[in-house]
């Protein structure tokens, strides 16, 4: 069956269609070819894609309008009552998200572990098909790793009405997957966030899966992880961490727009790192290494922004930021804790467990293709199974949507148990 829908029209239904929502795209038509069962191919006859359409840069006003309050649901005591990683603390059904009627949402708070080994509470949301029976074995799971949002509690995607990527994630729910979207520790919950730290975020992703299964028993045991930007680094870090865990249910990782380390991501942010991003980076380093002295990195002028970082999200920005050049002290990158932080976030040092699909756009200013190639070369050299899909003339905002067909095909192949394809040099 093929639907032709004018772009800008939201389709909401609890009927038979596996697509209950389509993203708001500008111009042209969206043609969705659907087959009975799991298989679906999406053909987009427009140049604008999911990432651009659903997360426009509308500034502080837009972020405020989409924000949800931080409720007592997210509050946890310090220290936490003892719990194993992945153990569910609490859950609640939540109906205030801007999601299609075909999607049910359940918020979760669960035990995870910080970089220092501390038991930390982490929040997230589980999205499942509404009113449908799961297949035998339960809903196949896509663990979603989100991109950079900031370090404030309010920057948690589960505290945004569109869950950060609502139309994109809803598409997968309507294809028959459950989506488990962690916030990362410290976003939502009252702990420090390890900004841009792949190993910490990967731990939160891995622990979100059993917690989600405890909250929503219809979830199956098999899962993949997919992430974009900071979440791409996280998805690859999950693959590396799984080398030591070897969860038989884990089937692979998709890294979109960021198959590289924290140092390269911050250095190659569009038009250079923003002042707030540098403040957030210092915050993340301090979270991973508590003995790190922020004043060894940041100037006196930057400290006010650093202390305000817990109140500001990257999207909303700050009214009076010092320039990036005024933020940092000369030679800050040679600080021992900064170097250790960047080194622990350098991909391709630990062999990945399971296949990786890397997706990037050659026009990506934030994640330079040559740096991605260097990371993939390291990973391939150590025997990782990497499939790299490059899209000419696409930037991060469009590559996440324009690569949907490849994403779906790769995910279907993993759950079907078909062999992986690699194109390592």
At which residue positions do the language-model features occur?
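Catalytic-loop region of hydrolases
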Residues: 51-133
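Alpha/beta-hydrolase active-site loop
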Residues: 195-215
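Short beta-strand/loop motif that positions the catalytic acidic residue
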Residues: 358-360, 364
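Conserved alpha/beta-hydrolase
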Residues: 146, 169-188
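Primarily recognizes the serine-hydrolase "nucleophile elbow" in alpha/beta-hydrolase
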Residues: 211-216, 220-275
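Accessory cap/linker subdomain of secreted extracellular hydrolases
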Residues: 58-71, 78, 256-349
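C-terminal catalytic histidine-bearing segment of alpha/beta-hydrolase fold enzymes
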Residues: 340, 366, 373-425
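Short beta-strand element of the alpha/beta-hydrolase
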Residues: 137-147
């Amino acid at each position: 069956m093929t639907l032709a829908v004018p772009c800008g029209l939201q389709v909401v239904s609890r009927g038979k269609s596996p697509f209950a929502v389509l993203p708001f795209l500008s111009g042209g038509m969206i043609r969705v070819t659907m087959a009975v069962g799991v298989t679906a191919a999406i053909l987009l006859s427009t140049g604008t894609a999911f990432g651009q359409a659903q997360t426009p840069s509308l500034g502080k006003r837009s972020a405020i309008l989409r924000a949800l309050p931080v409720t007592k649901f997210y509050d946890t005591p310090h220290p936490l009552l003892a719990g194993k990683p992945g153990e569910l603390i609490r859950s609640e059904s939540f109906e205030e998200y801007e999601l299609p009627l075909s999607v049910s949402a359940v918020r979760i708070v669960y035990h995870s572990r910080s970089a220092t080994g501390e038991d930390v509470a982490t929040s997230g949301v589980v999205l499942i098909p509404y009113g449908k029976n799961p297949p035998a074995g339960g809903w196949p799971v896509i663990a979603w790793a989100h991109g950079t949002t900031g370090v404030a509690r309010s920057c948690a995607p589960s505290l945004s009405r569109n869950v950060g990527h609502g139309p994109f994630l809803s598409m997968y729910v309507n294809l028959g997957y459950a989506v488990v979207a962690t916030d990362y520790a410290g976003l939502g919950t009252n702990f420090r966030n390890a900004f841009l730290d792949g190993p910490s975020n990967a731990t939160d992703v891995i622990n979100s899966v059993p917690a989600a299964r405890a909250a929503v028993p219809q979830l199956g045991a098999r899962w993949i992880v997919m992430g974009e930007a900071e979440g791409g680094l996280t998805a690859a870090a999950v693959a590396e961490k799984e080398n030591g865990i070897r969860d038989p249910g884990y089937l692979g990782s998709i890294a979109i727009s960021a198959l590289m380390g924290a140092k390269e991501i911050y250095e190659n942010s569009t038009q250079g790192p923003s002042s707030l991003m540098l403040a957030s980076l210092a915050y993340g380093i301090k979270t991973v290494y508590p003995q790190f002295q922020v004043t060894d990195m940041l100037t006196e002028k930057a400290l006010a922004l650093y202390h305000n970082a817990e109140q500001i999200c990257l999207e909303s920005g700050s009214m009076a930021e010092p320039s990036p050049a005024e933020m940092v002290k000369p030679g800050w990158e040679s600080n021992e804790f900064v170097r250790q932080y960047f080194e622990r976030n350098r991909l391709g040092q630990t062999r990945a467990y399971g296949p990786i699909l890397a997706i990037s756009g050659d026009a990506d200013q934030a994640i330079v293709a040559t740096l991605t190639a260097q990371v993939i070369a390291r990973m391939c050299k150590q025997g990782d199974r990497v499939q790299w899909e490059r899209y000419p003339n696409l930037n991060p905002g469009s590559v996440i949507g324009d690569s949907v067909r490849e994403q779906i095909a790769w995910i279907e192949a993993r759950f079907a148990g078909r062999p992986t394809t690699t194109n390592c040099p």
